[in-house]
Amino acid sequence: MTKEFNHTTVLLHETVDMLDIKPNGIYVDATLGGAGHSEYLLSQLTDGGHLYAFDQDQTAIDHAHIRLASYIEKGQVTFIRDNFRNLKTRLAELGVTEIDGICYDLGVSSPQLDERERGFSYKQDAPLDMRMNREGHLTAYDVVNNYDYHDLVRIFFKYGEDKFSKQIARKIEQARAVKPIETTTELAELIKSAKPAKELKKKGHPAKQIFQAIRIEVNDELGAADESIQQAIDLLALDGRISVITFHSLEDRLTKQLFKEASTIDVPKGLPFIPDDLKAPLELVNRKPILPSQEELEANNRAHSAKLRVAKKVHK
């Protein structure tokens, strides 16, 4: 029996519609999650089309077996329980070397945040965990209690962009010298105590950026996204498209940079023609990110920081 898996899909129609679905095409949902994007994408396919859906969380896959049951019966969907950084390898094992489109919904899913024992949220008391793949070895407890001061400062600055990273790392170092820091509440209170009073009056939870930083470190989120998106670009067939939803500046910056590198070429100006092997493989479909509508923002608080970028394969 699976737990309730409530998840409101962000930018649902925009993400899938921008893939310009071919009814008999081969598609990938790199981040199955609540299966919202998968369900809508499958509704656009004929019996000749197929979807490969990745997720490293078994709970998400169990839920999707219920939500997508009618498509499973027709043999239109294949679930792959793995990190999407293994995209190319896992698809190759299934005989897939080219795809017509792929979508990503990066970051942690709402059900993972809401499931207290997963330890993702600073709003609920739970053991420090934060693993998207529950079989992974590194946990938030390991990071908080075993990383030295300099490594803590590094990840807090790099992944949390918190200007009080040094003070927070020092406070953690002092606290764990007395006893291990074991819960999300303990950590959140330590973070609050390291920040000046005027900072605590600002909008947003004072622990948000540090929790984000630890979560990214535990799951190597940016490294996995970097590897996977590059593989996806390579896998795309001509005119195939890639849609990526991001939820914070680090993810968006990474996606924007990868798309830029794949859609521009470094050749001298004035060349009479550009050889095929030097042509950029991608073309940006939207120069600026697509944002949620006002209606969606009012209906789904999680959508507030969402940005969608889309690109198309124009050269192999």
Curated annotation (Swiss-Prot):
<keyword id="KW-0949">S-adenosyl-L-methionine</keyword>
<feature type="binding site">
    <location>
        <position position="105"/>
    </location>
    <ligand>
        <name>S-adenosyl-L-methionine</name>
    </ligand>
</feature>
<keyword id="KW-0698">rRNA processing</keyword>
<comment type="function">
    <text>Specifically methylates the N4 position of cytidine in position 1402 (C1402) of 16S rRNA.</text>
</comment>
<dbReference type="GO" id="GO:0005737">
    <property type="term" value="C:cytoplasm"/>
</dbReference>
<comment type="similarity">
    <text>Belongs to the methyltransferase superfamily. RsmH family.</text>
</comment>
<dbReference type="InterPro" id="IPR029063">
    <property type="entry name" value="SAM-dependent_MTases_sf"/>
</dbReference>
<feature type="binding site">
    <location>
        <position position="84"/>
    </location>
    <ligand>
        <name>S-adenosyl-L-methionine</name>
    </ligand>
</feature>
<feature type="binding site">
    <location>
        <position position="55"/>
    </location>
    <ligand>
        <name>S-adenosyl-L-methionine</name>
    </ligand>
</feature>
<feature type="binding site">
    <location>
        <position position="112"/>
    </location>
    <ligand>
        <name>S-adenosyl-L-methionine</name>
    </ligand>
</feature>
<dbReference type="GO" id="GO:0070475">
    <property type="term" value="P:rRNA base methylation"/>
</dbReference>
<feature type="binding site">
    <location>
        <begin position="35"/>
        <end position="37"/>
    </location>
    <ligand>
        <name>S-adenosyl-L-methionine</name>
    </ligand>
</feature>
<dbReference type="Pfam" id="PF01795">
    <property type="entry name" value="Methyltransf_5"/>
</dbReference>
<keyword id="KW-0489">Methyltransferase</keyword>
<protein>
    <recommendedName>
        <fullName>Ribosomal RNA small subunit methyltransferase H</fullName>
        <ecNumber>2.1.1.199</ecNumber>
    </recommendedName>
</protein>
<keyword id="KW-0808">Transferase</keyword>
<dbReference type="InterPro" id="IPR002903">
    <property type="entry name" value="RsmH"/>
</dbReference>
<dbReference type="GO" id="GO:0071424">
    <property type="term" value="F:rRNA (cytosine-N4-)-methyltransferase activity"/>
</dbReference>
<keyword id="KW-0963">Cytoplasm</keyword>
<dbReference type="InterPro" id="IPR023397">
    <property type="entry name" value="SAM-dep_MeTrfase_MraW_recog"/>
</dbReference>
